[in-house]
Amino acid sequence: KYRLVGSEMCIRDRPWPVLLMRQPYGREIASTITYAHPSWWASKGYLVVIQDVRGQGGSGGEFSGFNQEASDTSQTHNWVRSLPECNGLLGTYGFSYQGLTQLIAEEGTPPPDCIIPAMTGLSEDEHWSCEGGAFWWHLGIGWGLQLAAQKAQREKNWKGWHEIRENLESKKYLYNGHDLLEKYDPEGMAYKWLNLSSSKTPQWKTHKPLGSWLKKPLLLIGGWWDPH
């Protein structure tokens, strides 16, 4: 059993169309490095819901990356549509990891009314981690260590958190990032992808959106590729 936690924002107490973002980096941030603050969307007449995915931020359970998102997306959509503040319309937004959470769900899940993944990937090989068979070393390890640092923080492993931070700030992770991932997040996606990229028989996973979802209005700006 686990509980998913989200923050809601709207300007008045009445039913509104919902804008939903599901992300692993802390719902307080809400991707505001690239998107307007949720209060801006709320001022335009939306109920904005920013949710921490399973095992991240305030949500319970263990974080296992993309593998958990189809079932949790379905549950979240059902919950959002049941909110008294929701008028029945649901749109999703966010890029990168937040983009993929918009596209995968359990079979039979009703689609949202519109989808805005902006820039994301489906193939964990070609879209998320490698170029021409070569692993995105700087990007992949840096992102993996970001998630490993969040894991250490959640577990109150401050020694590990400080070691990861020092390596990121000094750029030492470019040399010993593989060892840090093995030490602090061996089950994480980045470490698994790194090892798969050097395997002679890699078993890469490609995520497949439901056909009914792809018939809905969808805004994809950067294509099926995530080099962010």
Where is each model-derived feature located?
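Catalytic cores of eukaryotic secretory-pathway lumenal/extracellular enzymes that build
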Residues: 50, 59-62, 99-102, 111-117
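Short beta-strand/loop motif that positions the catalytic acidic residue
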Residues: 220-222
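Accessory cap/linker subdomain of secreted extracellular hydrolases
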Residues: 35, 43, 104-108, 112-213
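Single conserved hydrophobic/aromatic residue that forms the stacking wall/gate
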Residues: 1-11
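Cap/lid segment of the alpha/beta-hydrolase catalytic domain
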Residues: 12-82, 129-130
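Alpha/beta-hydrolase fold nucleophile elbow
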Residues: 84-97
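Conserved alpha/beta-hydrolase "acid-adjacent" motif
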Residues: 227-228
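Loop/turn elements at helix/coil->beta-strand transitions in domains of secreted/extracellular proteins
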Residues: 15-18, 44-47, 86-89, 110-114, ...
